[in-house]
Swiss-Prot record:
Belongs to the RnpA family. Gene3D superfamilies: 3.30.230.10. Keywords: Endonuclease, Hydrolase, Nuclease, RNA-binding, tRNA processing. It comes from the Bacteria. GO terms for biological process: tRNA 5'-leader removal. RNaseP catalyzes the removal of the 5'-leader sequence from pre-tRNA to produce the mature 5'-terminus. It can also cleave other RNA substrates such as 4.5S RNA. The protein component plays an auxiliary but essential role in vivo by binding to the 5'-leader sequence and broadening the substrate specificity of the ribozyme. This is Ribonuclease P protein component. Consists of a catalytic RNA component (M1 or rnpB) and a protein subunit. The lineage of its organism: Bacteria, Pseudomonadati, Pseudomonadota, Alphaproteobacteria, Rickettsiales. One of its GO terms (molecular function) is 3'-tRNA processing endoribonuclease activity. SUPFAM superfamilies: Ribosomal protein S5 domain 2-like (SSF54211).
Protein backbone atom coordinates (compact mmCIF):
# COMPACT_ATOMS: atom_id res chain seq x y z
CA UNK A 1 0.00 0.00 0.00
CA UNK A 2 1.54 3.28 -1.06
CA UNK A 3 0.75 6.64 0.50
CA UNK A 4 1.53 10.10 -0.82
CA UNK A 5 0.71 13.55 0.43
CA UNK A 6 -1.56 16.15 -1.10
CA UNK A 7 0.81 18.65 -2.65
CA UNK A 8 -0.97 21.93 -3.26
CA UNK A 9 -3.96 24.04 -2.34
CA UNK A 10 -5.90 22.90 -5.40
CA UNK A 11 -5.75 19.25 -4.29
CA UNK A 12 -6.84 20.17 -0.76
CA UNK A 13 -9.80 22.16 -2.10
CA UNK A 14 -10.79 19.28 -4.39
CA UNK A 15 -10.85 16.76 -1.54
CA UNK A 16 -12.70 19.24 0.69
CA UNK A 17 -15.35 19.64 -2.02
CA UNK A 18 -15.70 15.94 -2.93
CA UNK A 19 -15.14 14.46 0.50
CA UNK A 20 -17.35 13.63 3.43
CA UNK A 21 -16.60 15.49 6.69
CA UNK A 22 -16.56 13.40 9.83
CA UNK A 23 -16.13 14.99 13.24
CA UNK A 24 -14.57 13.26 16.23
CA UNK A 25 -13.55 14.69 19.56
CA UNK A 26 -9.85 14.99 18.73
CA UNK A 27 -9.86 15.45 14.96
CA UNK A 28 -11.87 16.15 11.82
CA UNK A 29 -11.54 13.70 8.94
CA UNK A 30 -12.44 14.61 5.36
CA UNK A 31 -12.47 11.44 3.27
CA UNK A 32 -13.15 11.06 -0.45
CA UNK A 33 -13.54 7.73 -2.21
CA UNK A 34 -14.84 9.08 -5.51
CA UNK A 35 -11.66 10.63 -6.83
CA UNK A 36 -11.10 12.76 -9.93
CA UNK A 37 -8.99 11.60 -12.87
CA UNK A 38 -5.82 13.24 -11.51
CA UNK A 39 -5.75 10.87 -8.56
CA UNK A 40 -7.00 7.76 -10.36
CA UNK A 41 -4.11 7.82 -12.84
CA UNK A 42 -1.56 7.92 -10.04
CA UNK A 43 0.39 4.86 -8.91
CA UNK A 44 -0.50 5.65 -5.28
CA UNK A 45 -3.61 4.33 -3.55
CA UNK A 46 -3.84 6.65 -0.56
CA UNK A 47 -3.56 10.43 -0.59
CA UNK A 48 -3.08 12.17 2.75
CA UNK A 49 -3.33 15.83 3.70
CA UNK A 50 -2.68 17.14 7.19
CA UNK A 51 -3.72 20.60 8.41
CA UNK A 52 -2.36 21.61 11.79
CA UNK A 53 -3.46 25.10 12.75
CA UNK A 54 -1.45 27.56 14.79
CA UNK A 55 -4.45 27.74 17.09
CA UNK A 56 -3.63 24.19 18.18
CA UNK A 57 -0.16 25.14 19.35
CA UNK A 58 2.08 28.14 18.70
CA UNK A 59 5.27 26.07 18.65
CA UNK A 60 6.28 24.59 15.30
CA UNK A 61 8.05 21.72 17.07
CA UNK A 62 4.77 20.56 18.63
CA UNK A 63 2.84 20.98 15.37
CA UNK A 64 5.45 18.90 13.52
CA UNK A 65 5.26 16.20 16.19
CA UNK A 66 1.48 16.05 15.67
CA UNK A 67 2.03 15.64 11.91
CA UNK A 68 4.51 12.80 12.50
CA UNK A 69 2.03 11.03 14.79
CA UNK A 70 -0.72 11.32 12.17
CA UNK A 71 1.51 9.99 9.37
CA UNK A 72 2.52 7.05 11.54
CA UNK A 73 -1.11 6.31 12.43
CA UNK A 74 -2.09 6.30 8.76
CA UNK A 75 0.82 4.00 7.85
CA UNK A 76 -0.35 1.52 10.49
CA UNK A 77 -4.01 1.68 9.47
CA UNK A 78 -3.45 1.52 5.71
CA UNK A 79 -0.97 -1.36 5.94
CA UNK A 80 -3.96 -3.55 6.79
CA UNK A 81 -4.91 -5.87 3.90
CA UNK A 82 -8.49 -4.54 3.71
CA UNK A 83 -7.20 -1.41 1.93
CA UNK A 84 -5.32 -3.27 -0.80
CA UNK A 85 -7.20 -2.15 -3.93
CA UNK A 86 -9.10 0.88 -2.65
CA UNK A 87 -8.07 4.36 -3.79
CA UNK A 88 -9.05 7.16 -1.45
CA UNK A 89 -7.92 10.57 -0.26
CA UNK A 90 -8.24 12.12 3.16
CA UNK A 91 -7.47 15.26 5.08
CA UNK A 92 -6.96 15.10 8.83
CA UNK A 93 -7.38 18.22 10.95
CA UNK A 94 -6.39 17.69 14.60
CA UNK A 95 -8.29 19.49 17.37
CA UNK A 96 -7.29 20.64 20.83
CA UNK A 97 -6.22 17.77 23.03
CA UNK A 98 -4.84 15.70 20.14
CA UNK A 99 -1.27 15.86 21.45
CA UNK A 100 -2.27 14.70 24.95
CA UNK A 101 -4.33 11.65 23.99
CA UNK A 102 -2.53 8.30 23.88
CA UNK A 103 -1.56 6.68 20.61
CA UNK A 104 -3.66 3.52 20.91
CA UNK A 105 -6.86 5.50 21.47
CA UNK A 106 -6.14 7.68 18.41
CA UNK A 107 -5.42 4.56 16.37
CA UNK A 108 -8.71 2.99 17.40
CA UNK A 109 -10.80 6.12 16.69
CA UNK A 110 -9.20 6.88 13.33
CA UNK A 111 -9.28 3.31 12.02
CA UNK A 112 -12.92 2.95 13.07
CA UNK A 113 -13.87 6.11 11.17
CA UNK A 114 -11.92 5.20 8.03
CA UNK A 115 -13.20 1.62 7.85
CA UNK A 116 -16.79 2.76 8.35
CA UNK A 117 -16.63 5.26 5.49
CA UNK A 118 -14.75 3.44 2.75
Amino acid sequence: MSITSLKNQKEFELINKLGKKLHERYFILVIATKLPKIFLESKYNTFLGIKVSRKLNKKAVVRNKIKRRIRHLIRIIVSDSSFKDIKFAMIIIPRKGFEEINFSHLNYELSKLILRNI
